[in-house]
Swiss-Prot record:
Organism: Priestia megaterium (strain ATCC 12872 / QMB1551) (Bacillus megaterium)
The keyword Cell membrane belongs to this UniProt entry's keyword annotation: yes
GO MF annotations in UniProt: aspartic-type endopeptidase activity
Name listed for the protein in its UniProt record: Sporulation sigma-E factor-processing peptidase
Task of the protein: Probable aspartic protease that is responsible for the proteolytic cleavage of the RNA polymerase sigma E factor (SigE/spoIIGB) to yield the active peptide in the mother cell during sporulation. Responds to a signal from the forespore that is triggered by the extracellular signal protein SpoIIR.
């Protein structure tokens, strides 16, 4: 039976690269594309070396672990020992979850089993042996996406709620600094784009918002013409439907900021996919905070060490 080494190598190179990318997304690591591709190439070398006199070494677990060390080092570099092991263990986790998921789905579709010498052999009509290209190319990205979303959900659940954080809102090239409260009760999102909405007191924004826009935020239902909005702010205005206790559906005036920056657990988190909703109610009687932070912002933002 002919073996298409180039196709096998290309498949492994692609899978190793996607696993490293998934690792970077989960840990929110910054990476360069050429380093990511080189890391995937290092992992795929095992396939090529399997067809050399060194093939007996390539099947040894120690060699495979050594290759994974070099893959992670090439992709993310080395800053300190903890940084390296976080990357390495997350890479193993992604490999086991996605690889195990593929194997589980593969065996789910098996309809023929044969027991030989106390070993189970399977036959896979239409799926290839053991797993067809189409099965891998479709299933692998889907399982990667599923794994990433599940990890994000776990991270949101583990966030310490009712915690005050420093917040900077960059809006129309102006920066506002304030305190924010991470509140699990704030699950408001734009229904069209699924963009999370943080709530900010109107008093915190009055220094930079035009008077007409501030008046409109008090009674959004009165909006009738686009001319009511200053053209400088028109592209930043959004209307988000929401429901409060004892009241019917209402509209909240929200703004699209240039960026929101949070300081959470010694990390600076920068978020661009966020809306700033304007509230005319008092969020904190003792004025401990001026905004309510959507918990998802902690997960979706770009993280860097706080200076």
């Amino acid at each position: 039976m002919p073996i298409y080494l180039d196709l096998i190598w290309m498949l492994n190179f692609g899978l190793d690269t996607i696993l490293l990318m998934l690792c970077a997304v989960v840990l929110k690591r910054n990476y360069k594309w050429w380093r990511l591709l080189l890391g995937g190439f290092i992992g795929s070398l095992i396939v090529l070396l399997m067809f050399t006199p060194f093939s007996h070494l390539m099947v040894h677990p120690a060699i495979k672990i050594l290759f994974s060390f070099f893959m992670v080092l090439m992709t993310f570099g080395y800053k300190r020992l903890r940084f390296f092991f976080e990357n390495l263990l997350t890479f193993y986790f992604a490999t086991f979850v996605v690889g195990g998921g593929l194997m589980g789905v593969h065996f789910l579709f098996q309809d023929q089993f044969l027991v030989l010498n106390q070993m189970v052999d399977t036959k896979s009509p239409q799926f290839g042996d053991p797993i067809s290209w189409i099965f891998v190319l479709i299933g692998f990205p889907l399982l990667s996406y599923f794994s990433k979303t599940r990890v994000d959900d776990l991270r949101i659940k583990n966030i310490t709620f009712d915690q005050l954080v420093d917040v900077e809102i960059i809006l129309n090239e102006q920066t506002l600094s304030m305190k924010g409260l991470i509140d699990s009760g704030n699950q408001l999102v734009d229904p069209l784009t699924k963009t999370p909405v943080m709530i900010v007191t109107a008093d915190s924004l009055k220094e930079i918002l035009p008077e007409g826009l501030m008046e409109l935020s008090k009674n959004v239902q009165s909006f009738s013409h686009s001319e009511d909005i200053d053209q400088e702010w028109y592209s930043k205005v959004r209307f988000v439907p929401y429901r409060s206790v004892g009241q019917a559906n209402q509209l909240l005036l929200a703004l699209k900021p240039d960026m929101v920056r949070l300081v959470h657990q010694s990390n600076t988190i920068e978020v661009t996919k966020v809306l700033v909703g304007i509230s005319h109610t008092t969020l904190s009687v003792e004025k401990q905070y001026e905004c309510i932070v959507h918990p998802k912002l902690i997960v979706i933002g770009e993280v860097s060490s706080a200076s």
